[in-house]
From Swiss-Prot:
Its main location: nucleus. It holds the Pfam family RAWUL. Component of a PRC1-like complex. Interacts with BMI1/PCGF4, RING1 and RNF2. Interacts with KDM5D. Interacts with CBX4, CBX6, CBX7 and CBX8. This is Polycomb group RING finger protein 6. InterPro entries: PcG_RING_finger, PCGF6_RAWUL, PCGF6_RING-HC, RAWUL, Ubiquitin-like_domsf, Znf_RING, Znf_RING/FYVE/PHD, Znf_RING_CS. The modification Phosphoserine is found at residues 32, 116. One of its GO terms (molecular function) is zinc ion binding. It comes from the Eukaryota. It is found in: Nucleus.
Length: 351
């Protein structure tokens, strides 16, 4: 009985397996390499073409073994499209970040500007520029701005010229402008004066009106503005003429420093020498220097002036150029010939 049941079970399983195998689709035929077919003879029909056989590139459906490759191509195309979209999104995000940074920068710039949006230049208050356009002598705006070439400080022309009547130093930094002729080292600053006239409203008109009224009240002729002269045809001749005007003669090459060393009690009253820097001709003698000292100090005729250079008592006939050549650099100080002078009572008055 058991053997009969076992055989029935195996038969049942075999019948189920046959039924399941019958339901599966038949396997595809194997693909064989194309055979070399000889060319058909004349009048015979050849084999079907590749397009008729369902080869790739034809209008018919592809064989089932090529379908997975086509599906992979589609997926690959989708991934490439997705990568391009990601790159475009990243570029757009970078552009948006740059635009935000520029907007913040423009906001910072606009916060420092004036209220007017159309006005790009920053307005400056005149009070900030006032120290640069004022004369430190008269405390007013610069008129005929004149600059000292040694220190580049600028003043009104009339103020600085009046100051040099009693001093040879810059009124602002106290530097020595020139030992004897400080007016040699000043120049008109036309550019700065134009700036002052443009900054201060109606300053030029008021100055011209005051000058006109000044001359009119005193019955004087109002000076006309300077007109540039036409340049002559011969430039070489003009250059020579200018050199002859502005060139210092060779004999005016000795600058003196006169130092007072003392006076006897019997010399009486005398005025101190106000300016000890003197520029004279190299051909001038010690006698000329003595006359200069007598006139400036108001000395009595009986008072004798002794002039010394170094350890040498100088004679009246000696010229300054000879003294400088004979004594040498020991008598010089910063390019100046140093002369010491003293006052004594003449021996003729004692007898």
């Amino acid at each position: 009985m058991e053997e009969a049941e076992t055989d029935a079970t195996e038969n049942k399983r075999a019948s189920e397996a046959k039924r399941a195998s019958a339901m599966l689709p038949p396997p595809p035929p194997p693909i064989s390499p194309p055979a070399l077919i000889p060319a058909p003879a004349a009048g015979e029909e050849g084999p079907a073409s590749l397009a008729q056989a369902g080869a790739p590139g034809c209008s018919r459906s592809r064989p089932p073994e090529l379908e997975p490759e086509r599906s992979l191509g589609r997926l690959r195309g989708r991934f490439e499209d997705y990568d391009e979209e990601l790159e475009e999104d990243e570029e757009m995000e970078e552009e948006e970040e740059e635009e935000e940074e520029m907007s913040h920068f423009s906001l910072r710039l606009e916060s420092g500007r004036a209220d007017s949006e159309d006005e790009e230049e920053r307005l400056i208050n005149l009070v900030e520029l006032t120290p640069y356009i004022l004369c430190s002598i008269c405390k007013g705006y610069l008129i005929d701005a004149t600059t000292i070439t040694e220190c580049l400080h600028t003043f009104c022309k009339s103020c600085i010229v009046r100051h040099f009547y009693y001093s040879n130093r810059c009124p602002k930094c106290n530097i020595v402008v020139h030992q004897t002729q400080p007016l040699y080292n000043i120049r008109l600053d036309r550019q700065l004066q134009d700036i002052v006239y443009k900054l201060v409203v109606n300053l030029e008109e008021r100055e011209k009106k005051q000058m006109h009224d000044f001359y009119k009240e005193r019955g004087l002729e109002v000076p006309k503005p300077a007109v540039p002269q036409p340049v002559p045809a011969s430039k070489g001749r003009t250059k020579k003429a200018l050199e002859s005007v502005f060139r210092i003669p060779p004999e005016l090459d000795v600058s003196l420093l006169l130092e007072f060393i003392g006076a006897n009690e019997d010399t009486g009253h005398f005025k101190p020498l106000e300016k000890k820097f003197v520029r004279v001709s190299g051909e001038a003698t010690i006698g000329h220097v003595e006359k200069f000292l007598r006139r400036k100090m108001g000395l009595d005729p009986a008072c004798q002036v002794d002039i010394i250079c170094g350890d040498h008592l100088l004679e009246r006939y000696q010229t300054l150029r000879e003294i400088r050549r004979a004594i040498g650099d020991t008598a010089m100080q910063d390019g100046l010939l140093v002369l010491h002078y003293g006052l004594v009572v003449s021996p003729l008055k004692i007898t």
